[in-house]
Each structure stands twice: as structure tokens, then as C-alpha cells.
């Protein structure tokens, strides 16, 4: 942890997530980075777009400037006023304390580059750490390692997707089918459909145990 090397002041940093924020993705990445360094932050749900309240530490402020993230330094009195506003039962707001950076996995083929996938592109830009995992890792029991698994609009039927009717005779499509069947066989499954079913069941079972 870098916490003990940070110089602190008697104030807090508000990272707004409304239209005042220059870079929302980088702001989320900054929140993740802060949690990685074992510093607890407050997530102000429905307050200015779901803003973050972070201890005013010199190293954090330097990081905010480096990443060109909009922020405000607030005195304790200003912070208390905001929290009182959020606590009003007439408003739909809440303070959620965040203590730990989640371990994130994205279900995506290992040969897909970050810029070919919208989710990994966003996470890479935001500087949020993630692992790419795919079928073999899931059927071998890796899911308990992660707090959050991102799925796209996946087809777990093993039917090779929406291109079957138009591209099934194309060489690139047939090669993809062969690769998929070979990967399934290597893992001990009789077909891609059987492998995809096992993957889907692993994901479902992991979700039900959380």
C-alpha cells in the first residue's frame, strides 16, 4: 500500500460524475486505482451523477492532475453538508463506502485485441485492471478468483453465431468452426455445444453462490 507515503490534509476531494466531469472513464479508473492502494472512498449514488468522495492526499491529487480529471477540494464543513443532503429521506441518494478494488474478468477470446472489443477498450483507456478469460479457464474453475465477470451478448448454444446462414461456406467461417471444435475436443467435450453448455453452467453456478 502507498497509503503511508501519502501526505494528507484535513479536507476531501469530490470527483464529480455529472456534466462537470472532463473525463468520466478516467475518473472511474482513478477510483479503482485509489481502492487498489487500500484507501477507502465514498460513492455518492445519485449525487451529481454518482460522484466519488476521496481523502485529500497529495499523491491522489497528483494522479488526478496527471489523468486530467475534474475535481474539487472540499473542506469538512462542505462534505458534511453534502452528506446531510444525501441523508434526507425525501431524496433518492445514498453513500456507499468502497473498500476494495474488484477483480475483473472479461469473457473474450484470447486472440482478440483490446481495440477489437468495446469493453476491453474502455477498461484499457480508463486504466482499470482486468483479465481476459475464455472457455478453458472457466471450465477449469477460475471464476471464484473474480468479483466481476463481464459478458457480451454471448451465444452459448455452440451454433457458431449469426453468420451461419450467410457465411457457412466461406473458408474463414469453416476455419473458425474447426478451431472451436478442436478447442472443445482438447478440453474433453464432444462438441462446441457441449463445451458452451458447461461454460454457461459454470457461470450460472458461480452467480448462485455469491
Can you say where each PLM-predicted feature lies in the sequence?
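Aromatic-Pro/Gly-enriched surface loop or interdomain linker
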Residues: 21, 26-30, 36-39, 47-56, ...
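Short amphipathic alpha-helices in soluble, non-transmembrane regions
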Residues: 60-73
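Conserved small/polar residues in nucleotide/adenosyl-binding loops
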Residues: 207-209
